[in-house]
């Protein structure tokens, strides 16, 4: 079987696709897999680390604003979207997939649309409790719409196409025991482990709050190990702040731009402090992990708070 997974924008769109690809390869090692995303999105890096082939289609998001800079950006995005159709068709001709699966993010739109028009079976997965703009637009093209939450079903016009599947979690989350994960990270002194992150892109205000938390941890003699992911957008600012506050060399504080070995780090944790993206929630619930969630207020339709409240 030959399968294209198309996704992008944030790790929350990429990780479910990686989980599905891993499961398909496990069931049939001969499955040919191609990921399609944007040329410079973080999906390219995550897919490469997972060992899959990758192709790029130039496409960009649309900004919901009438400000001049947003309108200029949207003009560029409209041009990229128009060019993405022929590029998607070329990838389909070359790879000849039996199935195209979109897992969200604007990068998935041209591939799923082109596949549907070429009469190639298509599926879309929406992890969040409220569908994003891309998956709403793809409803007319997808043969099957998989959703992570039952609550999401009501937002679609074609209930006969909906399958409530949950959000898949990568198999490597279950490969180690908590003890093995801690030993892998050299956290073997019996102290608890706290893991915190604000999504793959980061959150400047929350990272500032974490700096104050780090200082309080130091004042109390670091009663636990702390692994924190800053995110792509705030890394340089955080590096400078850590040096200024003399926190950069603290052995019990592991601050990174991104947690690439999330399966090991989360498995080692006693507590996770995080946003409420659907993929993260699925990983936490699969592991039975205690968590403090701070939903992002800047997402479409406030879907992160709705994701988190489903767990109440």
Task: Show where each model-derived region lies.
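Active-site-proximal region of nucleotide-activated glycan assembly enzymes
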Residues: 34, 42, 53, 116-179
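Short amphipathic alpha-helix
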Residues: 13-24
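Glycosyltransferases and closely related glycan-assembly transferases
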Residues: 87-100, 107-123, 136, 140
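Structural loop-to-beta junction motif characteristic of Rossmann-like glycosyltransferase folds
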Residues: 52, 120-121, 270-271, 288-296
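Donor-nucleotide binding loops and adjacent catalytic segments primarily
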Residues: 46, 50, 178-183, 187-272, ...
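Catalytic binding pocket for nucleotide-activated donors in carbohydrate/polymer assembly enzymes
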Residues: 281, 286-312
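Conserved nucleotide-sugar phosphate-binding/catalytic loop shared by glycosyltransferases and other
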Residues: 3-10, 30-83, 232-234
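Acidic donor-binding loop of glycosyltransferase active sites
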Residues: 97-99, 259, 263, 267-281, ...
């Amino acid at each position: 079987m030959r399968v294209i997974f198309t996704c992008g924008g944030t790790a929350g769109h990429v990780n479910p696709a990686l989980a599905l690809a891993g499961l398909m390869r496990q069931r049939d090692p001969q499955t040919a897999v191609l990921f399609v995303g944007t040329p410079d999105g973080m999906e390219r890096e995550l897919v490469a680390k997972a060992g899959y082939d990758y192709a790029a289609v130039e496409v960009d998001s649309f900004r919901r604003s009438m400000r001049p800079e947003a309108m200029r950006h949207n003009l560029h995005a409209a041009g990229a979207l128009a060019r993405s159709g022929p590029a998607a068709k070329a990838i389909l001709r070359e790879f000849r997939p039996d199935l195209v699966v979109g897992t969200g993010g604007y990068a998935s739109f041209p591939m799923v649309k082109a596949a549907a028009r070429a009469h190639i079976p298509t599926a879309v997965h929406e992890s969040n409790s409220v569908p994003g703009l891309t998956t709403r637009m793809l409803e007319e093209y997808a043969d099957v719409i998989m959703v992570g939450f039952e609550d999401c079903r009501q937002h679609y016009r074609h209930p006969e196409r909906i399958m409530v599947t949950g959000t898949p979690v990568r198999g490597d989350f279950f490969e180690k025991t908590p003890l093995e994960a801690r030993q892998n990270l050299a956290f073997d002194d019996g102290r608890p482990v706290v893991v915190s992150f604000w999504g793959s892109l980061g959150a400047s205000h929350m990272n500032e709050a974490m700096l104050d938390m780090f200082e309080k941890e130091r004042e109390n003699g670091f009663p636990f190990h702390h692994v924190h992911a800053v995110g792509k957008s705030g890394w340089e600012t955080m590096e400078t702040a850590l040096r200024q506050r003399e926190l950069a060399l603290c052995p019990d504080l592991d601050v990174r731009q991104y947690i690439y070995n999330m399966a090991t780090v989360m498995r080692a944790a006693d507590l996770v402090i995080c946003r409420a993206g659907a993929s993260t929630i699925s990983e936490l619930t699969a592991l039975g992990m205690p968590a403090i969630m701070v939903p992002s207020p800047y997402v479409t339709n406030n879907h992160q708070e709705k994701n988190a409240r489903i767990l109440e």
